[in-house]
């Protein structure tokens, strides 16, 4: 019998060899959990985000407006990685301090803002009230659709007010909740759906995001003010901003699709954001009543949406969204594909994103790109110091 005596050194070496694969696997797992290194200072200094020397915007720099230029440089460095981003603008203290265009975007491009148009429609409701076309947000919806009065089977529809519609609390469901309803949205024939579309909640009782509800708001403004929505909007809103609507799609009855389908340049979208940041005033002219702006930016439904990256506590006002990003309260217009007009009142800042609108394309792939726009803007805002 041969007796084998292992020294302590031999035992330790044997244990070490057995454990080595597990230790290496653990180390790799730990490294994978660490945040990736950000861009170097040299890379950030090479980023060019200076506003283009065209148009009527007053321009400045982050330094002149008290903002860390490296934070802005990192924003634009990250933006360059996004394959569906078109335009990215930052306005601080009323001045354009950063601007760049990517992929198919350009300063001349009239981008399809998708549902960010809803916030514009809300502004036109406020102006219609101010001009006397409408008398109150408590007017009933069916007052403006008398041709369907005899076709209303659900008596609750007679109680729907303009206020309910503005707050997305009219009782009409999200169209994507039912394939037949979704098909109706793309039919191009909308007015009669006031009568035909079913309610799924009592008016005023619950938030339900409905494209048709906003479109009917646009029809109400057009009928009350005796003008198509695009002409009215250009005359009473965008002319005052020295801005121009590129186009605004119409339905089969000739009404502009008030829930979306408007084309604006990124710079003109930024002017609209600046208008709301300044309580409806633009270059000394009160374009939208200040009280209307204040009412529009309140949160009447909270939460109105799940958190999106850094965007938490998402609420809804009069066709405007609200959220908290980091320590900063924000309001924002939001369209499919990642169109964003973000207002930071405490920092006197507007951020505009235009992107591939993914026209008639929905699902996980379009949402992945859309969320990337939220992540881009949200991480930048969260990095900003408090005012």
Q: Which residues fall in each region the model found?
A:
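Flexible glycine/proline-enriched surface loops and loop-helix/loop-strand junctions
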Residues: 106-107, 197-203, 213-215, 251-258, ...
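Structured C-terminal helix/loop/strand segments within mature extracytoplasmic catalytic/sensor domains
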Residues: 335-387
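Non-transmembrane alpha-helical segments in soluble domains
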Residues: 76-80, 126, 142, 163-166, ...
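Active-site SXXK
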Residues: 94, 111-137, 165, 217-221, ...
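N-terminal leader/targeting segments and the immediately adjacent pre-domain N-terminus
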Residues: 2-23, 27, 31-106, 111, ...
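Active-site-proximal alpha-helical segments within enzyme catalytic domains
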Residues: 213-220, 260-281, 339-356
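Active-site helix/loop module of the DD-peptidase/beta-lactamase fold
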Residues: 112, 131-170, 196, 225-260, ...
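Active-site Gly/Thr loop motif
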Residues: 243-245, 297-350
């Amino acid at each position: 019998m041969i007796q084998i005596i292992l020294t302590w050194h031999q035992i330790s070496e044997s244990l070490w060899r057995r454990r080595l694969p597990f230790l290496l696997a653990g180390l790799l797992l730990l490294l994978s959990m660490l945040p990736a290194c950000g861009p170097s200072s040299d890379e950030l200094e090479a980023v060019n985000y200076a506003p283009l020397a065209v148009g009527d915007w007053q321009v400045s720099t982050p330094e002149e407006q008290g903002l860390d230029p490296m934070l802005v440089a990192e924003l634009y460095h990250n933006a360059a990685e996004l394959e569906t981003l078109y335009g990215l603008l930052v306005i601080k203290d009323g001045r354009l301090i950063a601007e760049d265009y990517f992929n198919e975007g350009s300063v001349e491009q009239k981008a399809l803002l998708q549902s960010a148009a809803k916030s514009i429609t809300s502004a036109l409701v406020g102006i219609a009230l101010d001009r006397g076309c409408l008398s109150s947000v408590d007017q009933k919806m069916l007052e403006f659709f008398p041709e369907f009065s005899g076709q209303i089977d659900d008596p609750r529809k007679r109680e729907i007010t303009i206020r309910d519609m503005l707050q997305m609390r009219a009782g009409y469901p999200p169209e994507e909740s039912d394939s037949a309803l979704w098909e109706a949205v793309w039919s191009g024939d909308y007015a009669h759906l006031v009568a035909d579309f079913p309610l799924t909640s009592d008016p005023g009782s619950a938030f339900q995001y409905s494209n048709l509800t906003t479109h009917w708001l646009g029809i109400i403004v057009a009928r009350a003010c005796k003008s198509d929505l695009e002409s009215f909007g250009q005359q009473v809103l965008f002319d005052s901003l020295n801005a121009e609507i590129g186009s605004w799609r119409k339905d089969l009855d000739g009404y502009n699709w008030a829930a979306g389908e408007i084309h604006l340049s990124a710079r003109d979208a930024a002017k609209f954001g600046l208008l709301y940041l300044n309580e409806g005033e633009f270059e000394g002219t009160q374009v939208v009543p200040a009280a209307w702006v204040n009412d529009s930016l309140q949160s009447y439904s909270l939460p109105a949406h799940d958190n999106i990256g850094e965007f938490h506590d998402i609420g809804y006002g009069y066709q405007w969204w609200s959220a908290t990003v980091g320590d900063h309260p924000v309001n924002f217009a939001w369209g499919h594909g990642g169109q964003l007009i973000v207002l930071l009142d405490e920092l006197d800042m507007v951020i505009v994103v235009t992107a591939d609108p993914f026209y008639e394309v929905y699902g996980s792939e379009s949402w992945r790109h859309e969320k990337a726009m939220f992540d881009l803007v949200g991480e930048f805002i969260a990095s900003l110091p408090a005012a």
